[in-house]
Design a protein with these regions (language model features):
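Acyl-donor-binding surface of acyltransferase catalytic domains
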Residues: 1-9, 81
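Glycine-rich phosphate-binding loop
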Residues: 99, 103
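C-terminal "cap" of GNAT-fold acetyltransferases
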Residues: 8-10, 17, 122-168
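Acetyl-CoA-dependent GNAT
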Residues: 11, 15-98, 109-111, 115, ...
Length: 168
């Protein structure tokens, strides 16, 4: 007996809308506490990142993409200006558990890279954690290289932060 695989879940990417930043903060806090035991200081960091994005948003140089399927939030990512010249920073990649393995993360990262090139950036930098194995695989697949590691316990657990970079 053979079974046909169900068709892949379809999704679209869109730019952020009112209410998205609060939802991004909420989902990050819930998921990272559940999966990695991050404490409320992580939620505080995400709140600052999303608030800074809204306060300083430059549509010519920055974006936040939301992946969704029929209005259901599947994931998100941000690209923001870094302090370094001609460098963008990839922030807040997150894919809901139900959407993992469907290409959502790959599509979000590709959107960042494509936009960064169009905007004239020469590099994209990011900071991630060694425990985020799925995200790390996606970054490596997209051509990012790990350039530095730094142990920390900023969110109540021992972690290894990783700095990655992509030359465009």
């Amino acid at each position: 007996m053979t079974y046909d695989k169900p068709p892949p879940k379809q999704f679209t990417l869109r730019n952020h809308q009112p209410g998205d930043m609060g939802y991004i903060t909420h989902r990050h806090a819930i998921i990272y506490e559940k999966q990695y035991n991050f404490d409320s200081r992580f939620e505080s960091l995400i709140s600052r990142i999303t608030a800074d994005f809204l306060d300083n948003f430059n549509p010519d140089l920055e974006r936040c993409w939301i992946a969704e399927n029929n209005g259901e939030f599947l994931g998100c990512i941000m690209l923001v200006c870094d302090k370094k010249l001609k460098t963008a920073k990839l922030r807040l990649l997150m894919v809901e558990e139900s959407a993992r393995g469907l290409g959502v993360g790959t599509a979000l990262i590709k959107a960042c890279i494509d936009f960064a090139r169009e905007a004239g950036y020469e590099h994209i930098d990011l900071w991630t954690q060694s425990v985020l194995e799925g995200a790390r695989r996606l970054y490596a697949k997209a051509g990012f290289k790990m350039i530095e590691t730094q142990p920390h316990s900023d969110w109540g657990v021992d972690l290894v932060g990783e700095f990655w970079s992509l030359k465009l």
